[in-house]
Amino acid sequence: MKLIILIVLSILISIVISGSVQSKITTTRGISNVYSKNDINNIKQFISSKYNGNTKLYGESLKDTFYGVGVLTRIGETNIEATKDICKQTKEQLKQNKFTDIELVFNGVTILSELKCLQGESSSSLGNEQQLQDLLKNKLENGSLLEKTQAINIYFTLSSAKAIDSKTVSIIDPLLIQAVNSMVSLMDEDGTFKSVSTDDEGNLQNTAAAYFALARLSHRLKSNEVDKLVAKVVNKVDTVLASADETTDSLYFNDLSTTSSLLHGLLSLASVNDKVADVISNKQINQISEYLLRQKNVESLSDAYHLIVALKRCQKNSISQPISLALVKSIYSPSGLNDIRVRVTDIFDQPIEASIVINKVVSSKNPRSTPILSGKEMKFQSSDNSFVADLSNENLKLGSYNFEFKVQPVDTDSYKSITNIQIITITGAVTVNDMKLSYAPKSDQLGSPKTTNEVQFGQKLPLIEIPSNNIARIFFRIASEAQPYQAQQVGIRFYSPAREAVVPATYSADAYSYTFTNKDACKILGCQSGNYQLDLIIGDQSITPLQWNFGEINLKFNQSTIPTNRYPEQLPISHNFRVAEKRPPQSISSLFTLLVLSPIAIFVIGLLFVGTNLGRFPTGMGFIYTIGFLGCISATGLLIVNYWLHSTMDVTLKNLALLMIPLVFFGHKSMSYYSNLSSSNIKKD
């Protein structure tokens, strides 16, 4: 018996262990997009366009400059425009402020630190040292949560740059542990942080700021007391994560700035407390990355800053760093199957060392069918940092196939393995020839070689910027076995993370084309400036459907962006009711009413002429039966009158059905009584 119990326990333990291990090694599909060099160049240009030569700042204030400088330093821009002027203007504003506005001081000190303008400086060069001490001391002791975190960040930034004197250090250091206690006391039951103790509830922005500040304090102070308080905060992280908005492939908190700040704070906490890694999963990091990559087209310095900060934290963190697998080409001819290529990169499109295996290949039409091939290892090509597989001998016919790639990174501490499915189309039925993208100020200049870009079938054009005053045309031919082919459906798809539109191509003289102006593009894309991928979509019942990503264009619109709306305003709904049938004349209606009421009238008139004889009214049980019968008949009459006045047929029939039970009973008893009475009278006679 003991042996059986031990066997059962061992089986249960093995199931639990295998389940937990399985949950740890579960792979994801990776991210579907990356922040490429083109995206970095675009955001550089956006930041540069916000520089104000008069104020020597980015945007309108020191806060905007904090955002602009933060973006440029994080994307590796070393030669920032007018660095000396920005530092000079920042120092002047700090001196004018006299250390009274904690937010302005935080922005200014951070700008100087990131531009390396604090090296060899002291805090006295920014203003009165005593005023700085008073500001930090006051905010650490009596400030709101955000003011405490800003004071902590100012202090650590100046300390790192050795730009603060020993007297200030001796005053502020003892207040830091007190600040930790004060901040943790502001944590609500749901894990969020209040601004002050009198607030009814906390919010996520406060929570993000508290996470980052507590992580810095834990790292700097090396105190067991602080670590215990941080652990108390970490125990509520799962509750905070549960408040996220989640879709199939993305996860976010309210908006971009909140998502970025909270991610930054959570990953900072993870660097000082290992339990955070048990709460945030690899899948959630990938979902947040997907959300961030959809926010590429920023429209403010604030959005640009929060986007880059969050992307950088995704790229480098102690939990999981997302990776992407992308096809170099998605369309192959049967003769080109010896060169199937993919690239594996991080979120900033940087190559990653890995090994790749094609797990299986199945038909896209029947994904559950038996794999055509499996376990095919791909070889690394250092020339372009891609992985190659030769499938020329695998008997792949024309059609679309689901390729399942298993990516195992070399650096398993930083990256997790992914399983990614990509669709590769093998087509020989139709080909696209003479694909050209041209643009010019006038339509009769569209054929100029200088502004015409050609691309071979299956390849992709580099990014092309189309001026807003130009006309653009996409021209191509579709052929089958070297003969012109007119497909049933041919469209051009414009898409970006924010917008998507498909327009039909026009067929004429054995060729397809689509011509558009900046105004046309603005109308179909909601005037959303940015980069748009171009896909050619061909559909026909007699060929394999084809979707080819042949290029990328940059469109800039002068009009303001039209916001998207899932529920656009529609025209009011008007109902056409059936015309009522013509009613009969009033005389006919009156005659019908008289006919219905005539039996009652005859009964009343008859009583007046004949009279009533109550002497023969029954006694005993006959009396009860007769009264019940007459009562039921009266109730039936009243029910009919009620129906005429305001009741409905459904209600009337239900009540009539109930009334028929006592009516039949009393009627039967009454008739039986009178029948027996008549029989007895006949016998007497």
UniProtKB/Swiss-Prot annotation:
GO CC list: oligosaccharyltransferase complex
Coiled-coil features, chain-numbered ranges: none
Short name of any one Pfam family annotated for the protein: Ribophorin_II_2nd
Keyword annotations from UniProtKB, A to Z: Endoplasmic reticulum, Glycoprotein, Membrane, Signal, Transmembrane, Transmembrane helix
Membrane topology: Multi-pass membrane protein
Pathway given in the UniProt record: Protein modification; protein glycosylation
Subcellular location: Endoplasmic reticulum membrane
Cytoplasmic side: 612-620, 668-685
Glycan-carrying positions: N142, N558
GO annotation (BP), single: protein N-linked glycosylation
Lumenal membrane side: 19-590, 642-646
Transmembrane segments: 591-611, 621-641, 647-667
Role noted for this protein: Subunit of the oligosaccharyl transferase (OST) complex that catalyzes the initial transfer of a defined glycan (Glc(3)Man(9)GlcNAc(2) in eukaryotes) from the lipid carrier dolichol-pyrophosphate to an asparagine residue within an Asn-X-Ser/Thr consensus motif in nascent polypeptide chains, the first step in protein N-glycosylation. N-glycosylation occurs cotranslationally and the complex associates with the Sec61 complex at the channel-forming translocon complex that mediates protein translocation across the endoplasmic reticulum (ER). All subunits are required for a maximal enzyme activity.
PANTHER family in UniProt: DOLICHYL-DIPHOSPHOOLIGOSACCHARIDE--PROTEIN GLYCOSYLTRANSFERASE SUBUNIT 2, RIBOPHORIN II
Subunit structure of this chain's protein: Component of the oligosaccharyltransferase (OST) complex.
Family per similarity comment: Belongs to the SWP1 family.
UniProt protein name: Dolichyl-diphosphooligosaccharide--protein glycosyltransferase subunit swp1
